[in-house]
């Protein structure tokens, strides 16, 4: 029997994209949602799947009011999971976050109110977090100084390209009220990104999953882990709901990046369940193999 290789090898990099955890210091979020429990449920699903991402990337609104106790609980929930699956944690600021508390408690840095912009190297894949928050407001904006910094960072391409992570997505708002809190002056950001090695933009803020392109770059918005927006609401209206939470899987290949939505919750099994061993047996029986990517470092599961 001849052996055929699958059209694509395994991904070079694997990330999990989470957003809008909105943890509170005590009680339930808006007296309706246990945000901590929802986050634990999402992370438990990742661990149970056997997935081993390079990084967990959180795109802002990590707490609802920027309270130190909420950040402490966030670390207590996320860091043990990250250690268990050997994943780096990458935090980005959101409009509900507090810069000084974010810096001191999550990054271990001096508490300042300067924008929280950082660069991470994941075995050749560059991840840049860009702070789109405006203290005291819920809309997003990126300053001239930040844009100059970003342009400088992007001047030298990374071996496997760059992923930009920020809270406010540079996409059209399909809910009218969301225009109040959109990212402003987006064309200035587009001018910096156009022609760069940025391969994908990860964002949150909207509390529903969506995709678009910006300056020719794919944009992937992750739903919230705490509550989401009902997109079947009356046109022109808005309604949050305790449902449809989740995260996104981001598989990075040489020529493309795949973003996949993972909804929270267990559902009735349809058809025959197949475990990993049986899946491998069937591929072998069919004479198909999936090649490993040419990556120096950890293997992708």
UniProtKB/Swiss-Prot annotation:
AMP binds at residues 22, 61, 95-96, 207. Keywords: Hydrolase, Iron, Metal-binding, Nucleotide-binding. SUPFAM superfamilies: Metallo-dependent phosphatases. Its EC number is 3.1.4.-. Fe cation 2 binds at residues 61, 95, 167, 205. Binds 2 Fe(2+) ions per subunit. The keyword Metal-binding applies. InterPro entries: Calcineurin-like_PHP_ApaH, CNP_phosphodiesterase-III, GpdQ/CpdA-like, Metallo-depent_PP-like. One of its GO terms (molecular function) is metal ion binding. It is an enzyme of class 3 (hydrolase). Belongs to the cyclic nucleotide phosphodiesterase class-III family. This is Probable cyclic nucleotide phosphodiesterase RER_40650.
